[in-house]
Amino acid sequence: MAAAPAEQGKGKRVQPPWSPPEGTKHSRLCLYNSLTRNKEIFQPQNGKKVTWYCCGPTVYDASHMGHARSYISFDILRRILRDYFKFDVFYCMNITDIDDKIIKRTRQNYLFEQYRKNKSTPAQLLEDVKTASELFSVKLSETTDPDKRQMLEKIQNAVKSAFDPLQEAVQAKLPAEEISRCHEILLEEAKDLLSDWLDSKFGSQVTDNSIFSELPKFWEGEFHKDMEALNVLPPDVLTRVSEYVPEIVAFVKKIVDNGYGYVSNGSVYFDTVKFGSSEKHSYAKLVPEAVGDQKALQEGEGDLSISADRLCEKHSPNDFALWKSSKPGEPSWDSPWGKGRPGWHIECSAMAGSILGESMDIHGGGFDLRFPHHDNELAQSEAYFENDNWVRYFLHTGHLTIAGCKMSKSLKNFITIKDALQKHTARQLRLAFLMHSWKDTLDYSSNTMESAIQYEKFMNEFFLNVKDILRAPTDVTGQFQKWENQEAELNKNFYDKKAAIHEALCDNVDTRSVLEEMRSLVSQSNSYIAAKKSARQMPNRLLLENISCYLTQMLKIFGAIESDDAIGFPVGGNNQNINIESTVMPYLQVLSEFREGVRQIAREKKVTEVLQLSDALRDDILPELGVRFEDHEGLPTVVKLVDKDTLLKEREEKKKIEEEKKRKKEEAARKKQEQEAAKLAKMKIPPHEMFKSEHDKYSKFDENGFPTHDTEGKELSKGQIKKLKKLYETQEKLYKEYLQMVQNGSAN
């Protein structure tokens, strides 16, 4: 067949030219880098591998919400880099178990426990508290920080409130039980005050190194338990200062050999002037404006390292200790410069360098560690490696406040992680953190946690509704439903939200915006479901399943879901070997359908008793098992299996509150009874007898039993007589009251 004329002009047929779509520019992950104070494109040094060092805790007390602020936030960042952006993250964290705070706390705890075991007499305790109070008053007068001063004043007032009752009980010769009770109260209230005094007096005599390892070992264990409870991933490598002393000594030696350190009186200091004047280096990269801040520098050196003799060892006030010569009462290790221990800043440099080498991608820590700790880390490490890029990206988590107030261990207003987990679940705490920027201040308050709880409920209800829709019976082909405009619109919104979430994660891992986009997607999905149900139509199963699986996967990436469930939060805890929902739900579905059939017959026959039983099953019995039936007119009952642990926890909380009220009431009644008994015992003493038993104070008395001479036979001064007369007159009144009570028959 002959070709048409037009076709003949084209010659041999070929494919037309093709050009790719213009598309959009792909976003790249940017992180806020403290080294530039700007968001920078994140580019690891070695392909997709990311080396990361995180400053761990100084383990001398319970982990608090300030710790949670850093470690949950870094856990979220780590998971997102690993599981969303698909980086190969190698994460190293340290444990500081050699530190001035640990040494001081260990000595104080040890000496106080020894003091308690020795069981001082009430008189001796009163005398010791008096002596310790003098030292404490000096400490108070030298304190300029208003918050810390307020805390010290509270301690002082508490001690005085406990001191006077014991003194009065001893003077009045109250029953031994009452004196013992007052003795224990004063001992407990004066613990901080006595510990300081005992440390100043006997601290240098604590020489057993093993004593200094017990405290950090215990608190490290508690820290790891807290992190596990918060679902914080363990580090790939954990380094302890006590296990890296040889590496630290070698690290310090090389810094000295490179000309950036000097030995002074057995200690080794970093020469900030020499380092800063080098063309290859810069000192205080993170907070250059803080150079010369002696208060911050001294806090970095530690309480045991800022005495006048220590400070005189430095060439410059800005220099800091790499190695500290140990004094009596401090743990020590051998070194080329004599017995000593590592400085705080050098510990991280040596351990991070040992594991990650001369340059790492990310270094993380709390905002308050920027200067001097991290600036000094940078200086030491770059002096050791003779480079200018020890850390490529420095990430600092924001502060944590408690209901708008500063949180500090020294102020004793911190909430421990265990305390927080008594009130809220690990997921709720994590959601609260996700709802805030990782680098900004987070206010831990009832409002913050209520927002997290409501978000969790909002998401969970959506997941439960979708699961109910997916359980509706259908054949194989029935799962593929025709798409109308509503499905097309929801699907478009779904992909728009996914794109917005990606943009937010690329923008300094903005989880706050991500959660809002997820909330918006759920709201759109809920509107779609409601519209379908209103029209008596079945929502598109596959579309809702895709949306739910995506949201679940994002929450898994954030560490808010641990289970392998495809959709939603796990039911019945996170460590179940079986899937409770898939096992139980078929039976609940049968029960629901049977109940609906019974209700239908009861309505037709107007059997109200059966309807009441049906409602009782829904409202009273099934909630006890963590099951919720939701009845909708004209539609099948929605069956939801909720977390049983949550219900049990709510009950336990209510029970605890009731028990606490009962305990306080009983305690108040007991105290009142004891006070009345003590008062009655005091009232029974005739005024002419009250001083006669005090032979250790007085030798002569007048006809009324009033003392006139002391034990040495000297007449009492007018001042002494005036003071005793007041006590005598007070006792006269009390005794008269007692006699009146006897007369009235009301005294026992």
UniProtKB/Swiss-Prot annotation:
Region (Disordered), start-end ranges: 1-25, 656-719
Show the GO MF annotations: ATP binding; cysteine-tRNA ligase activity; metal ion binding; tRNA binding
Q: Which reaction does it catalyse?
A: tRNA(Cys) + L-cysteine + ATP = L-cysteinyl-tRNA(Cys) + AMP + diphosphate
- Cofactor or coenzyme needed: Zn(2+)
**Cofactor descriptive note:** Binds 1 zinc ion per subunit.
Q: 'KIIK' region: where is this motif?
A: 101-104
UniProt motif ('HIGH' region) ranges = 57-67
Q: What are the binding positions for Zn(2+) in this chain?
A: 55, 348, 373, 377
* Protein localization: Cytoplasm
Per its UniProt record, what NCBIfam families does this chain match?
cysS (TIGR00435)
Q: What is the protein's name according to its record?
A: Cysteine--tRNA ligase, cytoplasmic
List the source organism.
Gallus gallus (Chicken)
Read off the lineage from the record: Eukaryota, Metazoa, Chordata, Craniata, Vertebrata
